[in-house]
Amino acid sequence: MLTAGLLLAAGAGRRMGGPKALLRDGNGWPFLERAVSALLDGGCDAVTVVLGAAADRARDLLDETLRADDPAVSVVEAPDWDEGMGASLRAGLDALASTSDHDAALVTLVDLPDVDASVVRRVLAAGTGPDSLVRAAYDGRPGHPVLIGREHWDGVRATARGDQGARAYFSDHPPVDCECGDLATGRDVDRPEDLTP
């Protein structure tokens, strides 16, 4: 199954005090690079990064890590990124639908520092093709990444609004949960105090 990683990194990060796409971990490694690496190392054939707030600075980070020249990595800007995650998801799926022949998109968020390649591999392994709808769960709590087969892209794009992402679509088309709590917490980083030293 040919799968594209879709990294949503467009938000302003108001509670964080700035865009999460610009964050670095305690070792100076950019969250953007960490997430792109997790997707590629975990088995995605390519990665589309969706930017919005501070897009130019985020592109500079990709340049710094040499990802800007990586043919497996592309960038799309969500013009209406400030409407929430739904806008970023629509922009990313629109880009994939018009430029790729991937069977599925594995959607993740930039602010999940402990979601690594092992989680990506496990969720990808649970997919079966263009009809797949699988999401990571952490001790039973739904999270990201979420594998969305191509057959679901139109439905997700039609219902993705605000900060709910694909939730409305999932209420009518429940995804298969793929337990990953033994690999990661899946917790996001929302505030400066959430960053581990």
Tell where the protein language model's regions lie, with residue ranges:
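Short aromatic/basic micro-patch
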Residues: 114, 147, 188
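Conserved alpha/beta core of the MobA/IspD/sugar-nucleotide pyrophosphorylase nucleotidyltransferase superfamily
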Residues: 1, 158-197
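Nucleotide and nucleotide-moiety/phosphate-recognizing core
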Residues: 2-142, 150, 172-183
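Short, glycine/charged-rich beta-strand-loop motifs at protein surfaces that mediate ligand recognition
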Residues: 111, 153-160
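Phosphate- and divalent-cation-binding pockets in alpha/beta enzyme and binding domains
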Residues: 57-60, 155, 188
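Conserved nucleotide-sugar donor-binding
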Residues: 141-155, 192
